[in-house]
Amino acid sequence: MNKNLIIPKDKIADFCERHHIRRLAVFGSALRADFSAQSDVDILVEFQPGSEPGFGFFDMQNELSNLLARNVELHTPNFLSRYFRDAILSEAEVQYVQS
């Protein structure tokens, strides 16, 4: 994880519990040296079985943007391009796992 990105673990855990997320991970430039003040944060979420946020997904993205004080691009494994999915899943750094 890039030192310029601070992930407040307690707030992320609260966010995930409220939104029925079983796993949240960061991927992309936030893990590399090219991450800058202008970079957004790519976040991958997996929901608990039977939990689908619908249009609330965009509200969640905005909430995470406010929480991290950066633009957030929220993704789910099924929305990732099949051409990049395996690479993203293998590089992603998990920040929350439902206990």
What are these regions (language model features)?
Residues 44-46:
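Short hydrophobic/aromatic beta-strand micro-patches
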Residues 1-25, 31-37, 48-99:
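Catalytic core of pol beta-like nucleotidyltransferases
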Residues 28, 42:
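Conserved G/P- and acidic residue-centered "switch" motifs that form tight phosphate/ATP-binding loops
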